[in-house]
């Protein structure tokens, strides 16, 4: 039986009179990989910020792990975010910290682990992303793809139930981008993490997604598999896939 782990219910959001979300409705199933597609300014990143409580919608409800995010205070939101990992576009590593210290940072901040447990957890997550033994390296010694993978190891270090990827393959060469795509799928299969991917990379979307949700003019205009989207008779979907909508 499928379980809905995230739900956006009639969500509205505007900035300076410009409507970004015009009644967003979307349910995300536990354990799936869902990608959010849409042109620039369609509100994809705002949706993620609303999900983790960095922004509040003007109207509507966002249910995460059976809790209404829009009604939580900051203390409760901080506790809720411990269940969520995020891989940023640029990996967002601390330049002055080693790989080990970067990955250990959220463990020290949020979990009560012994030093041995932290060392084991860091080693395990680096092994999962194919980077065993680089704990002592500094970020400036790493390639772009390695930085992304270290960022991913940090994102899963606290063993979250949900992970958010923001442009995970941007700026990477095709082979490295494919390695990141493979990791997204591999981690979901091994760990059962519910996964949300925000990207303009259609190859990434096609490769990793169980389902895809497309945003246009403040609404979710289509939800389905890649095969369902490419055969959709919704014109804006076809325009986006064919490159006729600026991303």
How would you label these PLM feature ranges?
Residues 52:
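Helix-to-loop junction immediately C-terminal to a conserved catalytic motif
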Residues 67-68, 115-133:
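Conserved ABC ATPase "signature" region
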